[in-house]
A protein has these predicted regions:
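Conserved nucleotide-cofactor-binding alpha/beta core module
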Residues: 52-171
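Class I SAM-dependent transferase core
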Residues: 1-72, 76, 89-105, 168-182
């Protein structure tokens, strides 16, 4: 119920390029550039639901893309750090945050594979877009009992995985399979 309420308070059309506004609510991944996508709304909802952000938590989202999921999470968490390296996507994210009156999301221009130790550790990390594996640097940025959500691509299947840090170990749990772009 909280996730639905968080979704309802953010207009997806404020977080897409102008040429995609009419398609902003379609249940398709929206192609933003030759190699970047905005995940479809129902997949973003599944991700946020499984991460289950709390009002006192700090969440890292990378790559932040247009900031849409970060905006939704901002209604559930204390702070969202949104890492993005594409200037055009950062501009869309910042305009969307301003238009929506969101002030607890910090958009940081940085390479996606760089760490954010200065802002962490984080209660949860969300990696948007399919990847081949989880780099250790991301797991090292989690607080104890922190959660990391990732879409792991193996051949032609993408599995949604949740990793939980417990002291010095990481436990993983398969959540669901989906179609997600890299």
């Amino acid at each position: 119920k909280e996730v639905i309420s968080a979704f309802s308070s953010v207009n997806r059309s404020d977080f897409v390029p102008e040429d995609l506004i009419l398609r902003s609510y379609t249940e398709k991944n929206l192609k933003l550039s030759s190699d970047r996508y905005l995940l479809r709304p129902n997949l973003i909802g599944e991700i946020i639901n499984h991460v289950s952000p709390k009002s006192n938590e700090s969440i890292l989202v990378l790559p932040a893309s247009t900031g849409y999921s970060s905006a939704i999470i901002s209604n559930l968490a204390e702070t969202v750090i949104a890492v993005e390296e594409d200037d055009n996507l950062i501009s869309i994210a910042e305009k969307g945050m301003n238009k929506s009156g969101i002030n607890n999301v910090v958009v940081i221009k940085k390479k996606i594979n760089e760490n954010c130790l200065d802002q962490g550790p984080f209660n949860a990390i969300i990696i948007e877009g399919a990847i081949d594996y989880i780099p250790d640097q991301f797991l090292n940025q989690l607080e104890n009992h922190g959660r990391l959500f990732a879409l792991i691509k193996k051949e032609d299947v993408t599995n949604a995985m949740l990793y939980i840090k417990n002291e010095n170990s990481i436990n993983s749990r398969f959540l669901f399979s989906c179609d997600a772009p890299k």
